[in-house]
Regions:
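Feature captures the catalytic ectodomains and active-site-proximal regions of enzymes
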Residues: 8-11, 15-425
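Basic polycationic patches enriched in arginine
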Residues: 2-5
């Protein structure tokens, strides 16, 4: 008989304890004086198409400051949700914050509403909206209404607020965002989400009717009826307001319960972002919002100003994603170079743990989010050095971090901050 581990019956009085992984991390967590920074270049990852000489914007960019960090850090790839799944920005960021995006699902409307400073109440249903252009038959011809200026968005939202104050028995709240974006909140009794998007997601199609995602929910059915009523009331108000004579709504949902960042990680956290959605994501998990910055340099200066007040900073940079969605290789490359040029400001107070990554990939050839794992660079005294001279998709493929689920990046940052006690004897 082959030798092996001795086995025997479990004594009836011996309880079998199965610990959830999050509970284990919580049990092992120690307080820290370290400073942790997550720098997100939205949609950073890309793909090289066209043979051996093909490259990506990150590979083509001149990035001396990122290169200097790469020499001292560890690289790898992050899988935002699961193989083959293309994430939205919400799941992508929640994963980076260490929240399983399959367990904690949040509608984009909720995120945008919080980011714009709206206080959501129990029973509120929020939708992210953007103005669009429609032809005479109601077919969407431009999903972003020519990227109208924020001032025009504010003017149109003001008009809608005057003309459509309620639908059914629900109050309607309308808040303008940046550019063509705005938020609609339905405030009433007996409402819930999620609902399907009133958005065809491409030009050449009419706006679809919003329906409950979960069949049989009376509260969601009522909310869907309010969305339909809002369209009937609001579209006539926009008639003739080209290029913004229509609007799309998506991420229609109510606010879920999510444990706060400080409770989960014992870290005081702050967010430095420009766009409302990312402020909303941060607020959703209890981060403070450091307002007042518009440029990268200003964002990094806000970090310097607040350095001593917080343990963890989430800093968000949008342009890489925006140009990826436009399919503009050169502009995305330039956006990466602009980030690199501003990095010395951040490094005036170099964090103990610095993670640089994206929330997902936005390849220029695809002009949209994709399922490709995004590159990640982790720099700390204890991360170890892969000794690569650059930070790119190609070097990330060879890095010591390998391919990790994005939800574990936060735990790796904690480990590098020496925040975990030893597990077991």
């Amino acid at each position: 008989m082959r030798a092996g581990r001795a086995t025997g019956p479990v004594h009836p009085s011996t309880p079998l304890i199965i610990m959830k992984l999050d509970d284990l991390y919580s049990e092992l967590t120690l307080k820290t004086k370290s400073k942790l920074v997550l720098l997100v270049l939205d949609g950073l990852g890309d793909i090289a198409v066209g043979g051996a000489d093909a490259t990506t914007p990150l590979e083509a960019a001149r990035t001396p400051n990122l290169d200097a960090l790469a020499v001292t850090g560890a690289q790898g790839r992050l899988l935002p949700v699961a193989p083959g799944i293309t994430p939205g920005s919400g799941p992508g960021h929640l994963g980076l914050f260490g929240y399983d995006p399959l367990e904690f699902q949040v509608g984009r409307g909720v995120i945008e509403a919080l980011g714009l400073g709206l206080e959501l109440k129990p029973g509120d249903v929020a939708a992210r909206a953007n103005f669009c252009t429609m032809d005479a038959k109601g077919v969407v011809t431009d999903r972003r209404a020519g990227r109208i200026d924020t001032s025009i968005c504010e003017e149109l939202c003001g008009l809608l607020r005057q003309k459509v104050t309620s639908v059914g028995d629900a109050e309607v709240l309308i808040q303008p965002g940046k550019g063509h974006r705005f938020v609609v909140v339905f405030r009433g009794q007996g409402l819930e989400g999620p609902l399907t998007d009133a958005d065809p997601h491409r030009e050449g199609l009419p706006i679809p009717r919003s329906e409950p995602v979960v069949a049989g929910s009376a509260k969601a059915a009522k909310a869907a009826g309010l969305v339909e009523a809002f369209y009937k009331a609001a579209l006539p108000v926009l008639s003739g307001k080209l290029p913004a004579n229509g609007f799309l709504m998506r991420g229609i949902a109510h606010q879920p319960d999510i444990p706060t960042f400080e409770v989960r990680y014992q870290l005081r956290a702050a967010c430095v972002a420009v766009y409302p959605m990312y402020k909303g994501l941060a607020q959703l998990v209890g981060m403070s919002k450091l307002e007042g910055s518009q440029t990268l340099t200003e964002q990094f200066e806000r970090y310097l100003d607040a350095h001593d007040a917080y343990d963890y900073f989430f800093i968000h940079y949008k342009n890489t994603d925006m140009y990826g969605e436009d399919g503009n290789f050169e502009a995305k490359k330039k956006a990466i170079e602009e980030l690199d040029a501003a990095l010395p400001v951040l490094l005036k107070k170099r964090p103990d743990v610095l993670a640089i990554t994206g929330d997902h990939s936005t390849p220029c050839p695809m002009k949209g989010h994709s399922w490709h794992p995004q590159p990640v660079l982790l720099v700390s005294e204890f991360a170890g050095s892969d000794r690569f001279p650059r930070f790119t998709e190609a070097t990330s493929n060879q890095g010591s971090l390998g391919i990790q689920e994005a939800k574990f990046l936060m735990r790796l940052m904690q480990a590098n901050a020496r925040m975990f006690d030893k597990f077991g004897a």
